[in-house]
Design a protein with these regions (language model features):
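Beta-strand-rich binding/interaction modules
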Residues: 26-46
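Residue-level preference for alpha-helix termini and adjacent loops
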Residues: 28, 37, 65, 96-98
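Non-cytosolic beta-sheet module surface loops
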Residues: 19-21, 34-37, 64
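C-terminal beta-rich recognition modules with glycine/proline-rich loops and embedded aromatic residues
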Residues: 3-19, 23-25, 55, 75-230
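Solvent-exposed beta-strand/loop surfaces of large extracellular or lumenal domains
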Residues: 39-65, 82-87
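C-terminal beta-strand-rich structural cap/linker in extracellular carbohydrate-active enzymes
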Residues: 30-32, 62-83
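Solvent-exposed, conformationally flexible loop/turn segments
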Residues: 26, 57, 67-69
Length: 230
C-alpha cells in the first residue's frame, strides 16, 4: 500500500493498493482508517465511489478483495478553530496542527565565551519583524471564525515543508500590536491578560504551522475592536 498525501496540511489522503506476486491477483483484508476527533464530515471513497461517511473519533473499515490499482481516498475536512489558554489567550488551530505567527528570523553564529561543555560556539536567532500582536476578541467568536481567518494553500512541490519559507498553508487574520508587551530577558515578556485595549491600528498578520517556525507566538492575547458594535 502506497500513501500519497500532503497531510497534515491538505485534507485528502490517497492510498494506492499494490498486490505483489505473479499468481496472486487479489488480496482480501479489512482496511481500517481512524478518523480524528477534530474532524467533521469525513468521507471514504474507493476508486472514486463513496463508501462511508464515518463520524469523528471513529474507525472506518472497508473489507473487500483488493486489486492492484485500487485507490482509497480519505478526506478529512479541516476547519479553523480557536481554543483558549493561559490568561484567556487564543490559539488558532486547523485540523491536527496549531498555527503560530510568522516572524522574520536573523541567524547568527556566536562564540561561546564560557565553559566549552556544549562546544565553542552556538547559533542564536532574533526577530526581524514585529511579534507583539493581539488577535481581536470579536474574530475568535465561533460565528466569526470562518470569515475572520482566511486559509491560503501554497504548492511547494517536493520541497521540505517544515521551514519558514516553505510552509504549505498560511492563515491570514487581523492583528494589532500591543506596545506594552515587550522582550524580557531576551524572550517574549509575560503573557498579557486578555482583553486589552490599544489605539494601534489593525494589521493583517500571517500564521503558519507551529512546526515551521523557530521563533513563534502561538498564544495570542485578545483586544477589542472598539470601532464596531458586534
Amino acid at each position: 500500500m502506497y500513501k500519497r498525501q500532503q497531510y497534515p496540511f491538505d485534507e485528502q489522503i490517497r492510498f494506492e493498493i499494490r498486490i505483489d506476486g505473479r499468481k496472486v491477483k487479489t488480496a482480501e483484508f479489512p482496511l481500517r482508517l481512524r478518523i480524528p476527533g477534530w474532524c467533521e464530515g469525513a468521507t471514504v471513497a474507493v476508486n472514486g465511489q463513496a463508501v462511508a461517511s464515518p463520524g469523528k473519533g471513529s474507525v472506518a473499515e472497508e473489507r473487500r478483495a483488493w486489486r492492484t490499482g485500487d485507490v482509497v481516498t480519505l478526506r478529512l475536512p479541516m476547519e479553523v478553530a480557536v481554543s483558549r489558554w493561559y490568561e484567556r489567550s487564543a490559539v488558532v488551530e486547523r485540523g491536527p496542527l496549531v498555527y503560530s505567527l510568522r516572524i522574520g528570523e536573523q541567524w547568527s553564529k556566536v562564540r561561546n565565551p564560557g565553559k566549552q561543555i556544549y562546544g565553542p560556539w552556538y547559533y542564536e536567532v532574533r526577530p526581524t519583524t514585529p511579534w507583539n500582536y493581539t488577535l481581536f476578541e470579536e474574530d475568535v467568536r465561533p460565528e466569526r471564525i470562518a470569515e475572520a481567518f482566511r486559509v491560503e494553500r501554497r504548492d511547494i512541490g517536493d520541497a521540505y515543508p517544515w521551514t519558514l519559507e516553505n510552509a504549505p498553508v498560511e492563515i491570514r487574520a487581523r492583528g494589532r500590536r500591543l506596545d506594552e508587551w515587550v522582550l524580557y530577558q531576551e524572550s517574549a515578556g509575560p503573557q498579557p491578560y486578555s482583553t486589552n485595549e490599544t489605539a494601534n491600528p489593525a494589521e493583517e498578520i500571517t500564521l503558519i504551522p507551529y512546526g515551521c517556525t523557530t521563533l513563534r507566538i502561538t498564544e495570542f492575547p485578545l483586544t477589542r475592536d472598539l470601532r464596531k458594535n458586534w
